């Protein structure tokens, strides 16, 4: 499982580092002539939203088709192929900033392609777990994968700002570093054990009908999907708005502006680890309402209080 964990870490790191680089480049260009105030905050929000939508929309639109292919092609093959694509995309990001150091259209094109790449990679990385691990180790294996994912989000989000700031007048060096990391992920993917395709029959619409039938028959599955949608929507909105808050309200540098967003991932990653330990060898649904109550409570606190940098980190 080590190869899968490293490949996943590199991919999630690059996704988030590049996404925040694109957002920060957009904010930098849009707010260069603006004084602190509402206009600066609006411009920052617009650029951050643009980066998030450009990454997320292709991911959402291609997720179902990605799941179809993950069932009919060896998941190991999908993982290795997507790691190779990631290397090419990070190289393209490097060329984009070589051509236009301020960002521009091609950085957004690469970001959209990273969204498609992530959509294709995700069902393979999660779907391969039951093929690699016995049932009693699935909860623990999933928690470790989630921990690596959120460690990657944490470090990638933070590194995006630091790499961009460190690159100075040569911003192409930042995605070049991501290209080297992508090469490491590609090498690690070859260590994933071979597995056979899960299915070799049925078309795309057969898969859709099967998925809808499973949803209709399983109430817990419907609740789990609904909960996941709400959770990731809230997480995305919080990360997006914390970045704007850091830049437009706190006036932080590119290097520091991504730190508050990164700490959100610390909490999620630690939560995934705790859930894995509490669940042991079973799936524990009772922990979900407890986690939801915690999210609601701390969001209310954040809404009532306008914290400084230290309070935002907490």
Label for each model-derived stretch:
Residues 1-314:
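Alpha-helical transmembrane-bundle signature of multi-pass membrane transport and export proteins
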